[in-house]
Amino acid sequence: MLLLLGLCLGLSQCVGSQEEAQSWGHSSEQDGLRVPRQVRLLQRLKTKPLMTEFSVKSTIISRYAFTTVSCRMLNRASEDQDVEFQMQIPAAAFITNFTMLIGEKVYQGEITEREKKSGDRVKEKRNKTTEENGEKGTEIFRASAVIPSKDKAAFFLSYEELLQRRLGKYEHSISVRPQQLSGRLSVDVNILESAGIASLEVLPLRNSRQRGSGRGEDDSGPPPSTVINQNETFANIIFKPTVVQQARIAQNGILGDFIIRYDVNREQSIGDIQVLNGYFVHYFAPKDLPPLPKNVVFVLDSSASMVGTKLRQTKDALFTILHDLRPQDHFSIIGFSNRIKVWKDHFDISHSRQHQGWQSVHSPYVAHWRHRHQRGLAEGHQAPQQVRGPQWHWRPERVPHCLPDGWEAHGRGDAHPQDPQQHPRGRPRPSLHLHIGIGNDVDFRLLEKLSLENCGLTRRVHEEEDAGSQLIGFYDEIRTPLLSDIRIDYPPSSVVQATKTLFPNYFNGSEIIIAGKLVDRKLDHLHVEVTASNSKKFVIPKTDVPVGPQKAGKDVTGSPRPGGDGERNPNHIERLWSYLTTKELLSSWLQSDDEPEKERLRQRAQALAVSYRFLTPFTSMKLRGPVPRTDGLKEAHGMSAAMGPEPVVQSVRGAGTQPGPLLKKPYQPRIKISKTSVDGDPHFVVDFPLSKLTVCFNIDGQPGDILRLVSDHMDSGVTVNGELIGAPPNGHKKQRTYFRTITILINKPERSYLEITPSRVILDGGDRLVLPCNQSVVVGSRGLEVSVSANANVTVTIQGSIAFVIPIHLYKKPAPFQRHHLGFYIANSEGLSSNCHGLLGQFLNQDARLTEDPAGPSQNLTHSLLLQVGEGPEAVLTVKGRQVPVVWKQRKIYNGEEQIDCWFARNNAAKLIDGEYKDYLASHPFDTGMTLGRGMSREL
């Protein structure tokens, strides 16, 4: 499947290059004009954007992987240049975020619903791109942009994936293909498994798309520069090759796949159950069980399209598989071209009984197989050129089917094949079908639908690859069935919204995963009952699993990443549950033939994907406008519009192109900055929008004082404190203070805090994350977004309804009375409650009125004189019934970018604020108590 996101920034790409190419072919153009153009073109090719950094950070916790890819580019040319970011990701993964930084503009991805009407068109395009460009088991993400001359760009891609256990190992693959050598290239993988890590290996870099058979694979060790640190439950793997080491691997920058395989410890019991914040996951993978007998039918395309290498490789693989069959196993081979032929098996005399048993199912099985594929072609493929001759004589696309199951078959039942519960004891059960498509023109969507209808698996083999070894590898995954008809039950009073609990087969080396919600978060024990068939006997183990007290979730990703819409939920088990549920809804939608049912499944899958920020066939990604820097804050007031290109986004999983012009267009800022703020030494400004009044005041605090700026701990859960620092000694004659630290505490939905200084941002939501302020980055953690614009400002967005902007004021050569310091602006207060308090928070929902008219006609001379010193006439302001004397002043905000008129309240805002200045002093930066307002008790 091709994963494509086209982001067209700026004017039409390569216009100049196209014109030059046309001019070269013009016979009337003089040779003297051609040479300079050719030289210029060669220079452009030589000075293509330089990739300064390519890094991948992945965190795997309990099989669930969070991965963030960061790529930074530099345009060294004297003109704008096109650049493309390309990344291969696992086909099973969901993209959760994409962010671009072009120059100083930040474009943030947003997952939205996809319009249903474009589904048919998109489906065709998706199939085409998948077949032509898609890697086996991977999707390709592409994003293009235009980098201004001498400027930088950065791309951040985040995706999530649940690792599947195959052949006794979990495999985590990271594509390292930056397309050029990079001075800073790194892959950092953290693995956290509470059950304990039983084995861990890093494979050599793999540049082939094939998975391999797992038999006798290369064991030459990890790539050079790989460092592995491991203990019982945690492992850290770092791959950080130098430019020389990269060049030895591949001079074109296509290093290959960095692959980690590991397994965990298991107890011989009901399985491993983990619980966190009301969600649970159950890993079930028993071992040391006797294998079940299996019946294998190979359905092979014997038409002319298979003649040659593909047929030879397939035959070699089948002979290898036949030698692997156990004495109790049965097999048959069915070939088809324009007719169907059944080859009877030729076991030795000891297998004659099994041979006779198989003969009884040949005819009905062939009929069932033919009917299934005819219906699949009619519904999923609809390609008339693939139907030849009579109605049931058809030619599929080079598709060999390997069809094993875990039961003895003595006929075919009428029950629906994918529901094992519809096959009671003693009744024949359906086969498990392994559908393998060989070639680049396989209709993979058809195979997926057939697999879902028959509880099967689907695999792809490309023509240029070693099909034989891959066929053996696919067979190895299902060669040893241990259980059948597995059903896992939990008490309905304890568990709701569980994922699939019925499974037709369990194979050695695989794993069954179930996730769901707990009704009672304080549950001590969870009753689990497993019903399964093992070699003609039904096994029913029951037990009460202790779940213990549940701890608060942690942000396990621990890496700087774009996001901020909560897509990286600290509760990894909740994310795992949403991932599995979405996958099952998509599979049910693909399998269903009932239109009302398909629409219901589509709506459920779409709603869940939007809620958890998953990019699926039913959702698309759009880019929000750029986040303004401090030096561009005036744009929010309409003084100047930021001219930027409107990106055109194509859904990565098949959504149509979003409408939008390619020409430049003014952007609406994502956040409209209000005047309610505190900055400088420290100067407070509060807005009363209902009265169209702006009031300002100063607080003359002492160095070390911690001021309560916003206090809404009891309602929205947000508290903001600011710590003062004094001017250097022997400086200005007046004592000056500035904010050196802004602390933001969030109590809902999870407790976390931010500590911001002019040099760094510390984010602690369970795991500690330190961001330098001299680098632009966007990170997020369940409803909290932190956007750092290098040496300019920090924007904090909480639950999408609260936003703060903290400007960073740095001085190259500070005067004696200057210090590096911070400001604080309330950009969005919608999510703060009416009970919000603090030096700034108390004014967010209040009104004020001016009770005396300033500067009457007889006061014009006095007014003019006062204007010369920056002050105007006095008046009386009424706030909360209190009379506050104020004087008209002019004050600069936004680091001097804008000058405002305000009414100034003297004496530390006496009578303007509730209580006194000392009532707003916090005992420490993380104090959430308040002596004023509704929260009278002080909480430490």
Swiss-Prot record:
Q: Where is the VIT domain?
A: 35-161
- Asked if the keyword Membrane belongs to this entry, the reply reads no
Q: What would be an example GO MF term here?
A: serine-type endopeptidase inhibitor activity
tRNA processing as a keyword? no
The lineage's top-level taxon is Eukaryota
Q: Which species is the source of this protein?
A: Pongo abelii (Sumatran orangutan)
> Where does the signal sequence lie?
1-16
**InterPro entries to which the protein is assigned, alphabetical:** ITI_HC_C, ITIH, VIT, VWF_A, vWFA_dom_sf
Q: What is the lineage of its organism?
A: Eukaryota, Metazoa, Chordata, Craniata, Vertebrata
Q: Where does the record place it?
A: Secreted
Where composition is biased (Basic and acidic residues), the residues are: 407-417
Q: What task does this protein carry out?
A: May act as a tumor suppressor.
UniProtKB keywords: Glycoprotein, Protease inhibitor, Secreted, Serine protease inhibitor, Signal
VWFA domain residues are: 295-478
Annotated glycosylation sites? 97, 127, 231, 508, 774, 793, 860
Report the main location listed first in the record.
secreted
According to the UniProt record, one GO cellular component term is:
extracellular region
Q: Where is this region: Disordered?
A: 117-136, 208-227, 405-432, 541-571
Entry protein name = Inter-alpha-trypsin inhibitor heavy chain H5
Name the cystine pairs. none
The entry sums up its family as follows: Belongs to the ITIH family.
Name the Gene Ontology biological process terms.
Answer: hyaluronan metabolic process
